[in-house]
Amino acid sequence: MSTLRVLHEKSELGKTTVYPKEYAPHLLLPIPRDLNRKTLNVNVSEPPPFYGYDLWNAYELSWLNEKGKPFAARGEFIIPATSSHLIESKSFKLYLNSFNNERFADAAAVSQTMKRDLSKRVNESVTVNFILHETEIPVAYSPKGSLLDVLDIAIDTYSPDPNLLSTSQETVTETLYSHLLKSNCPVTGQPDWGSIEIHYTGPKIDHAQLLKYIISYRNHEEFHEACVERFFMDILRHCRPQELTVQARYTRRGGLDINPYRSTNPTFSVQNHRSFRQ
């Protein structure tokens, strides 16, 4: 069954929404990662050829204490890339809203409930953190590397084309980034805007051609997580780096932003540095 068929049958995307009045964990819609990975010719009977996570920031998160007083927080959810499933975004939004009128002893009880529900849906332990005070908010940052967007290029390709990628014989270690990433929701067609950062060691990637490749996603319809895995696999196969990390930070929609990270490095650390567009 294709990802699109699963979504059309089960997702609330593109449908009139009735917001839940009470706690509703059944709203969470898990989608098998294998559905997309098969289209990338990834052997789904083996562990994926990368490590990483999907980091979600939730900006519209609230619940009641036992006296009925509302509390609010920013939520941080880290789903391992090795999990069998991802969570469809609108179902996640509705699930979070189902906490609005529920009473809990404290924030820890809320986060533990969410951790249990999410981990059950994706078949792996999900990390849940709450940011409760302004002093805990990470500052915006700019990647330490070369901005590709300043390059003067001509392009008329707006669907992913890995043949745009090219390398030289020189071996380098460098970080490249762009704020021109745009793809689209495969169900609603809504645009997904983001910034992408690529760090690698290997044959030097032609910067202009890489920018063209990034822009080629402009009319592509695929989820955030799937786009980043396509980026990773295309660069890995066509440019043959010894080390590769690809991460994207998407702007928020419906109170959520999604930030997938994929790497050849198994010892990565989770970083939640918000881009200036977030």
Swiss-Prot record:
Which residues does substrate bind?
Answer: I87, E88, S89, H224, E225
State where the protein is found.
Cytoplasm
Name the residues that bind NADPH. Answer: S89, K90, R253, G254
**Where, by residue number, is the active site?**
C185, D192
What domain of life does the native source organism fall in? Answer: Bacteria
Query: A Gene Ontology molecular-function term?
Result: preQ1 synthase activity
| Listed GO biological process terms | queuosine biosynthetic process; tRNA modification
Instruction: Provide one Gene Ontology cellular component.
Output: cytoplasm
Catalyses: 7-aminomethyl-7-carbaguanine + 2 NADP(+) = 7-cyano-7-deazaguanine + 2 NADPH + 3 H(+)
Enumerate the residue ranges of region (Disordered).
Answer: 255-278
Enzyme Commission numbers on file = 1.7.1.13
Identify the enzyme class: oxidoreductase
Purpose of the protein: Catalyzes the NADPH-dependent reduction of 7-cyano-7-deazaguanine (preQ0) to 7-aminomethyl-7-deazaguanine (preQ1).
Output this protein's name.
NADPH-dependent 7-cyano-7-deazaguanine reductase
Organism, as annotated: Coxiella burnetii (strain Dugway 5J108-111)
